[in-house]
Every structure is written in structure tokens, then in C-alpha cells.
Amino acid sequence: MPPVDPHSYTDGDHPVTAKAALAFYLDFAASTIHASALLTLSAPHSGDLLLDTRALAVHSASTASGPPSPIPFSLADAADPVLGSALTLTLPPDTTSFLLTFSTSPSASALQWLSPPQTASSLPFVFSQCQSIHARSVFPCHDTPAARITFDLLLNVPTQLSAVAAARHVSRRDPLPSDHRGACDDALWCAPGRIVEEFQMEQSVPPYLFAFAAGGIGFRDLGPRTRVYAEGGDKVLDEAAREFAGVEEMVKVGESLFGPYEWERFDLLVLPPSFPYGGMENPRMVFLTPTVIKGDAAGAQVVAHELAHSWTGNLITNKTNEDFWLNEGFTTYAERRIVEVVQGEERAALNMGIGWRGLNRMMERFKDNMEYTKLKPKMAGIDPDDVYSEVPYEKGFQFLWRIERQIGRPAFDEFLKNYISTFKFKSIDTETFLEFLKTNVPGIENQIDLQLWIEGTGIPPDAMEPESAIYKKICSLAAEFKSGKLPSEDEVADWSGQEWELYLENLPTDVEASQVTALDERYKLSESCDYEVKVAFLQLAIPTGCRCYFNEVEKCLKQVGRMKYLRPLYSSLARCSGEEKMLAHRIFSEAHEFYHPIARSVAESILSKHG
């Protein structure tokens, strides 16, 4: 039984799911989905078949062709803390499809259910976040990026709500008894006050890109194939529409660089502030944190990254999470190429500078376990969420930039387009990429130590710090801070959030409380509306013992659930002793129900690690 993926029960000798037809009844009162899944395999199969599940109650399994007959199944009693529970089906000879009925748990790791008081619309809300290995908590599946699926989805929701999904919207209509295939009884499915939203995803995607949301959602059109959705009414929608007004132009830039956009639409959903990521690249419907709406179009930076995934990550996908750099390193490179065209070379270089500082910071984070500074780490038994970091993004970017510098941009552009067209709608591993690289760039292995880049720990000696006038100027100003010199108002007059972020990232960590407060008194960084700036400043302030910022830290941790902010703030508090550590535990005890389950688990692990 060869494993396909260290994070899945999928058996490499067996066919995998090729299509899923899903019917979901969203029970907001119980924070539960009552569901059915008609799964079609990539080839006929007989005997045992393993699927991934986590905290699912599986009610029945039956054949889907001819008169239905029960299929024997068993669910492992003891759930693995990382993998969940294997669902074993004993299929009749030459089975190609079968039907499962099941229910999710209120604690499903992919789902967050928000009650009306927790939303801006005063209506209930639910959204999914399946990356890295959480689709198995929504429906039984081969939850590995090696197994790409198409899917149909029916979402049965209260009529006052709207639903969206990372798929083509087919219709909004009355429920029909024939819809649900046993997900629940007819009376519940067709009850008054319910509506069905129907979706189809015809291009194959890995299960982690399955996504939906339902709530008081409205929208604004941005262009012929772009639209922004949001919960929170006209004010939020208008702000989002202004922030992302240039998205259609960005799509065109992406096509000019990387080839045709294969997903038809590029829509955006601004989620409630508990969303645990900056953005999630779900095809056709990118999920975004509201913290990217800054009022200065800077949020387009996050959108550029998620757009770039349309080619690198969604079209070509890492085969396992050990190959995650293939998704994120390529996408970080592609994002910066888009930014370079749309916002200029200086802005792209600034982006690279922030990334360079982030990569160096990860070396410190993983100094006691350098395995996770490799581009291809060994991750058996490790939850990907626990070691999520900037390494695959920034070291992956550095590797690709190193190749570009070696062969020249025109040749690298040709290589990149060839790579995308060759492997689109496929999942590949690092070894496949390296073979493709060596075949298409003969002799590259003699010019770059490929093994050192992929298997080596730390930052390779031929990685390069970015060069630009603004980057050097900001680093120089940061170096002067130690001696007590603050940047003048003229020097920062044109700074956006990114400039401040880079400045704060480059400040020495062993600073005095008086220096921190002096900086804040002049520039009010602790009150910034840009969370990148605010959190970077608070992270600097916490170790100095500046208790005057405890209120701002608490507000951040209670108002926003993005892990990019939770990790450094909880870590900074928990690494201290006394009052700071107590504050971290108190805030978490009061705020944990606000967090998405993924973020909650990460915060718990930080507090547990530091006692």
C-alpha cells in the first residue's frame, strides 16, 4: 500500500476520486452540514478503498449504478491527530461510483460558523478554508493535492442568505426532493424559507481548493470577468470596489506574462475579520481578509499574489505539502512580476526586500529544527499548519530568481510559459520540476547547485538581497535607529504601509522602551489602520515591556483572526514572563471562539509551547 502523500490515507495502487456531486443542507442552528456525496472514481475498482475524513459522521454508503445496494464501510475508531480517520469502503466488483451520506461536526476544522451578533449584516455566516488538509472535515475525499477533482455543488440555505463558491454559479432556485440524494429528509430539504444555490466546477482542482461561503453577501462588478463580494453592506462593498478597481487590468497583465487565464472569472470575496489568511486562491472566487482594504489600493498586492496562483498553484499544483514551494515560490515570483508591470520596479523591489527580511526571520524561528528551512522538508507526522512559514514563498522565490539571473529574463520567461503549458491541470513533485528544468535548460545543474537549493538547510550563498534605492534608504534609516535617530517627516512623507513595514522589520530587536515610545509619539504607528504596520510595531514594542501598548495588542487579537498577526503577537507575549504571558492566556481565553479553527489551533500550540 504505497502512500501517495504523507498527509493522506490515499493508496497509490488504487484509483482516486475524479468527480464529486455534493448536496449540502446548511444547518446554522446546529453548526452542521447534512450532506450526500456521489463520488466517481478515475477507474473501476473492487475491494477496499480508503478515503480521508476528520470528525465526520458517516451514515451510509451505497452503489450508485443500478438498484442501490449497501456498501460495507468502517470508520477508524481512533483519529490520527494529523490525518484524521480513514474511511474504508469495500466496493463490489468494477465499481466506478458510489453514494455516501454524512454530517459534519460543529468543530469541523475547515468551517467557521458565525452567529448574527458576530457579523456586520446581523445574519448568520459560514465559510470554508480547506488548505492544507481540511477538506476531509467537510466531505470524505482523497484529500491530497495529487488527486484533482471536478465537482457539482448544491447549497441549501435560508432564503435571506446568498451563497458563493469557487465554481460557476448555475442557478438560485427552489429545492427539489430529487436534489439531496439522502442528505436529509425531503421535508427538511424542501422546507419553506429555504433556497438552493447550484454550482459547477468543470476544471479539475485539488480538494484544498474546494470552497464556499453563505451569509448576507452582496456584490459590485469591477469588470467584464471580475466582481467583488462582501458581507457588511454598501459601505464595505464600496470600499472594496475602490480598493480592487484595477483587478481586471491585473488579469490582463498576468495573461501577457504567463499565458491564457483558464478559469473564466476572477471574483473576490471579502470575508469577516476572523478569516485566518490574507487571501486564499480558490479558483474563480478568491477569499480575502478585510484587513487588505487599506484605502490606498495597497490591497492589490495580496490580490496580485492570489491572481498569480491562477497559473502557479491552481493550474499546476504541488503533489504533496512537501512540495509546497512549487505553489508558493512560483506564485511569489509571478506576483512580483505582475507588481513590477502594474506598480513599477521600485515597488516590486520593496516587496522583495520585505520578503528577504521575512526569510531571514524564518531562519531564526527554525534555528532548532532546520529541516523546515529546506525547500523540500520531510513532513510525515507533521501538521502543515504547524510549520507554515515564509520559507516556501521566499526561498522558493530566491531559487527561481537565481535561475532567471543565470539564464536571463527572456529565456526564463520562455521556460516559465513552457512549464505552465506542459503541466497545466496536473499535480507534480519537485523531482518532476527538476527533470523538466534540466531538460529545457541544458547544463543548469553545472551552473547552480540544485541539490543545495532543494535539500539544503538555511539560505544558499548565491541567494541575493534585492537592490533598489528605496530599499537601501529604508535599511539605512533603520540602522540609525539604534543610535536614537528617528526618520524625519520629510524622509517618510511619501511612505505607504509597505515602506513602514520594511523599516520596522529592519529595526534591531534589542531596543529601549523609550525609543519605541518616541517613534510612536511621532508617527502614531500603534494606531495605524494598516495592520501590517500596527502589528510590526507592536511586535517590536512587546519585548521592551511597554505596557502602554497592551490595550492595542488586545484589540488586535480580538478584532482580527488572520494568522499572520496572531502568530507574532501571541509568540511575543508568550516568550515574555509575568504579565505579558498572563495577558496572552487571558486574551486567548476570551477570543478563541472568534477565531477560525485553524487559527485557534495555531494559537493554542504557541501558548502550549511557551507554557
Curated annotation (Swiss-Prot):
Q: Which UniProt keywords apply?
A: Cytoplasm, Hydrolase, Leukotriene biosynthesis, Metal-binding, Metalloprotease, Protease, Zinc
**GO CC terms of this entry:** cytosol
Q: Does the keyword Cytoplasm apply?
A: yes
Membrane-spanning parts: none
The record's SMART domains line, in alphabetical order, gives: Leuk-A4-hydro_C
Q: Single Gene Ontology BP term?
A: proteolysis
Q: Which family does it belong to?
A: Belongs to the peptidase M1 family.
| Name of protein | Leucine aminopeptidase
Q: Could you tell me which PROSITE patterns the record lists for this protein?
A: ZINC_PROTEASE
**Cofactor (UniProt):** Zn(2+)
Cofactor detail note: Binds 1 zinc ion per subunit.
As recorded in UniProt, coiled-coil segments are none
Residues binding substrate are 129-131, 278-282, 562-564
Checking PANTHER family in the record gives: LEUKOTRIENE A-4 HYDROLASE
Q: Which InterPro entries match?
A: Aminopeptidase_N-like_N, Aminopeptidase_N-like_N_sf, ARM-type_fold, LTA4H_cat, M1_LTA-4_hydro/amino_C_sf, M1_LTA4H, Peptidase_M1, Peptidase_M1_C
Q: Enumerate the active-site residues.
A: 306 (proton acceptor), 393 (proton donor)
